[in-house]
């Protein structure tokens, strides 16, 4: 049917229609090819913003480094990274003066975290640069490889399982004269297959030892691998993001813990909270400014945008901040926290896979690895690439580029927010000593600035002063991209404020639809998304009902499970029709078995199996919820599962949904082809970890499982737990004397094995 789109907006206030202009429907753009070009751009831009700084050479790695700190004061509006140490320290001091005890308390909280955090904290997160293999790996594998190499090089503090002890090993590894690592490689040989008598290629995975000297090891330890950021909407150009290795991660985690603790205590900070909590926090700041600007004052709000936030931040500045924040704390704590910014001042950016290179005349495609860019003849490249390579050449060492200034995306979100808030905090009248004053909101690089003054000149003066103050700490407010409005209408982190936050529903659009996990989870996630949007995002009843019908339709097409009495023919219809005819109570069939949909907006909170349980035929119940059903490999059953949903911006969110395990909760098997690649050893390691962890959890059900304190290993903990449980079971008569004796014997055997090993 034809709809004139303007009709949709006749009754809608303009600010509510804003969300229709967002680029959120359809698939987001993904990048292809290597990120080498984007990374070079980042490195070159970062150096350009700091070009008037001082050049030095790192004595350990020989890397040239640019230090813009306390560089020339800006004379124009170009973005620059010349932060002034004394200005940053003054902002910190005033932040503390206006929030007495904030740094002290946050340090105490962080110290407690530092002493308790286990090394497995580092297994969270997705792809991580694995310095032993010089490429990306899942975080858990990268950590395991690092620990394995550390131990074989005599670094054993990590065996306590505490993150802080692992970090002691990292520090020690940097003082060693060299490190021996194990790398994986593939051997191919042609052999004759006994069965078919044909020649086949046989691949075997070899491990070989390799020695890295001190310089090579340090370069790897300080390396951030780079990739292209995928799925960014509303942009034409892609950009590079970084993933640090295990040596850096632990230190960054502690710094961010401290900064997070500070952000929680600052009313202007948009981190670390999110969603409705964030909206409430921000609405408070706006309310304060509007209430205080009585009839005599004007109040304006800038929807702010900063130019290249990360590339103008500087790790040396963060070091100054940390030194100030922790100034009355014990020496060991100050040292642990200062290592992350020091490592970042000496970081190296890995240029990724290299350049794809095609020659039209010779019909040739080849990839030039990043390592070769330092000395390849530039006549093969086009003009723009040539410029890029020429600029970056002086910085190259072993295929990585020395990148001292700048921060790389997403590394110190919390700490950079603290810096931003400290400038917003300088807007109080008792500090500015003028008729104007300001306040605002900060969330990583996004900000909103609210300026109050008796007249327009005052507003202009306030904005100018804010702009200049920012420049002094390496923050560059973009005059082109920021815009000013009467307070009451602004945008901050894609929340639109119009006398209260209006729901920006289009941001949730990508999470509607069928997820593709399995029939059971998809149904549950689909209705939960609709339910959550009715609660949080002004999804009205009529629209929700329509969304539900569209979802069911989508679901049936995805899994080819149209109702048993439909005319639609698919490859499943024969079986589903048969089931439909055999079933007495047809309303009891799940939608995925060709049943009718019983969901409406009043019962979205009930899992489908529960909704239909009373309506099901008895034999259908027996087949559906049968743990012995051979066609289903069951996970351990939890009542709540976590799905990853993709909102339109920000990282993928985890969303809880009710999980009722049925024969529809299947788990697809791993693709076999990985088993023939060099990844195979890694896969086996992963499975071994999985088995150990599962076994451990069997001994310590989550209710009683507190992280082990002290140095007992997993095995010791399990053995002692088994003994205690056996004794309790024996004394209460749950097990016989013989069984008790057998358990004790097994425990002793295990301990004996450990001693021999």
UniProtKB/Swiss-Prot annotation:
Chain residue ranges for the region called Disordered: 50-82
Subunit composition and interactions: Influenza RNA polymerase is composed of three subunits: PB1, PB2 and PA. Interacts (via N-terminus) with PA (via C-terminus). Interacts (via C-terminus) with PB2 (via N-terminus); this interaction is essential for transcription initiation.
Sequence ranges of Polar residues compositional bias: 55-64
Leader sequence segment: none
GO terms for MF: nucleotide binding; RNA binding; RNA-directed RNA polymerase activity
UniProt record similarity statement: Belongs to the influenza viruses polymerase PB1 family.
UniProt short sequence motif Nuclear localization signal, positions renumbered to this chain: 187-195, 203-216
UniProt modification remark: Phosphorylated by host PRKCA.
Gene: PB1
Pfam families per record: Flu_PB1 (PF00602)
Protein name stated in the entry: RNA-directed RNA polymerase catalytic subunit
Alphabetized UniProt keyword annotations: Eukaryotic host gene expression shutoff by virus, Eukaryotic host transcription shutoff by virus, Host cytoplasm, Host gene expression shutoff by virus, Host nucleus, Host-virus interaction, Inhibition of host RNA polymerase II by virus, Nucleotide-binding, Nucleotidyltransferase, Phosphoprotein, RNA-directed RNA polymerase, Transferase, Viral RNA replication, Viral transcription
GO biological process, one term: viral RNA genome replication
One GO cellular component term: host cell nucleus
PROSITE patterns: RDRP_SSRNA_NEG_SEG
UniProt entry tagged with the keyword Nucleotidyltransferase: yes
Domain RdRp catalytic: 286-483
